[in-house]
């Protein structure tokens, strides 16, 4: 089989056609601290400056060999655009931590109605993201770009004072303003997603980070998660763009709701999920990605050797590869502390073990 471009390879696997090899997809915070320090930037500079963000994101493909670009590389874009304030805390020896919310836009239920859907071409750091996507698309037309939107409940936690703790309480109380806030965050994500698509993104990825199995029930997931993600999925699906869904922690109790309710093109699994179970039960209905451990179990991507990473990746490839519909990826974000040599090992494993005959 002739060698495919990253775009051809990624689309083939997503649509259950046979690629030349398993694609390697990096997502969620795929800017590593090592590279930021090597470039002598702080995270505040990277996240607010188009040229510097471009330099860091570009390395996902040019340095590590991933089959995609992924941005934003932090989770606070929508929350900041909706009015929350960020601080960038210095950490001795570590450059700069990612931005953290220091002042929330919504303190009382009445605050929700004071906030308008932000214009992605003007609000916060959204224009920076759009500028970088346009530049990546122009320079690397054969490398797919995944634009990222926060899951609506996660954005709520970035704008609601009290974050998840208060969100869970308001959910239990069936507070109507939470649905109003979820709708505002959903429409913000839709507007941002459409702008990223117009700029050149070929897919929209999302994550559900706070609505995990240890915190919410399937009934709550069905009420507070599924309908809002489905609205995003439908909005971008109408443009012919796939929705890529990642559920943090153990997605097992929610999988039927995700597959049948949200209907994403692909689900990227955390390493808490049995990939063999997921492939056997859902692998003919949706494409899957995963799930080399980065945060739980042995966290091999974070703490293992390159050889251990390759061995773990080989096991995932052997499960996911048959019949196509599979991307090799980490079980959660390739965050900024992951050793560069381990990211390269993940990519190398696909070249050695993921070639289709």
Predicted segments, located by residue:
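Glycine-rich, N-terminal phosphate-binding loop and its surrounding beta-alpha-beta segment
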Residues: 56-87
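Short, structured active-site "lid" loops
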Residues: 44-55, 62-64
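Residues forming anionic-ligand binding surfaces in small-molecule and nucleic-acid pockets
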Residues: 106-113
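Active-site loop segments of alpha/beta catalytic cores
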Residues: 1-39, 43, 56, 67, ...
